[in-house]
Amino acid sequence: MSCAEVMYHPQPYGASQYLPNPMAATTCPTAYYQPAPQPGQQKKLAVFSKMQDSLEVTLPSKQEEEDEEEEEEEKDQPAEMEYLNSRCVLFTYFQGDIGSVVDEHFSRALGQAITLHPESAISKSKMGLTPLWRDSSALSSQRNSFPTSFWTSSYQPPPAPCLGGVHPDFQVTGPPGTFSAADPSPWPGHNLHQTGPAPPPAVSESWPYPLTSQVSPSYSHMHDVYMRHHHPHAHMHHRHRHHHHHHHPPAGSALDPSYGPLLMPSVHAARIPAPQCDITKTEPTTVTSATSAWAGAFHGTVDIVPSVGFDTGLQHQDKSKESPWY
């Protein structure tokens, strides 16, 4: 047996390398021969070593999983078990004092909410106070808008301005600056004796009824007076015809009796009925009384009628009367 045969054992066909015999290498150091490994063989060796490492790593992980499962099974077992009846068994898994654990849990939760969101807690507290602050500011602004007399106990709301003229004896009390019945300047009936134009009526704005509809029916007498001075004979029959038409007081038929005190003095005098006599006898007296009343009231003051606010009714009647004359 040669030295080469001793060093190299026979290998099957296709072996990648020959491993020397250590005994032969010691006896024949010169005959020791180890061929260089090829690149493909190195890759195979690296893959094999990695597989062994992965197997070694997975084995302890499986053991850890098994240990954890065993611990969970032990935890799932109830700490106490109480038999209530044949169909009910009470298992208690909690170990320790339940009350102390619950208190600790809620105190910890509340403490974390305050420490994590301090701004939100402050904003919520402000939001709870803002409606009260807004209400107080709104009340203070409203209090400043009203007069001081409104907040006193002796304050009384002022009456409507039109109530002062319902009756001359009716007294209206109110704070200064409101309408009073003692001041006759706003009413047009008290200004007819003046020669200059009367101031505009300030109370007519609050009166819902137009003044022309109240006094316009009685202006036929004034028209008769006016036509008597300018056309004494040409239209006498027309005046008598109008007189027969207005024999009964026209203002009383057109107006409600409750509006009687609101009329002017001359109109109020014209509305007083004459004694019940013959029509032919009362005709001159009625014409004379109405003519004298209107002539005395409107002596030199016919031009002030448009300033009082009766121009619309007068113009309308003048246009209706001019059609048969001209």
UniProtKB/Swiss-Prot annotation:
Ranges annotated as spanning the membrane: none
Cross-link Glycyl lysine isopeptide (Lys-Gly) (interchain with G-Cter in SUMO2), sequence positions: K62, K126
The keyword Cell membrane appears for this protein: no
UniProt biased composition (Acidic residues): 64-75
Superkingdom, taxonomy of origin: Eukaryota
Tissues/organs with expression: Enriched in placenta.
Keyword Ubl conjugation in annotation: yes
Name assigned to this protein: Transcription cofactor vestigial-like protein 3
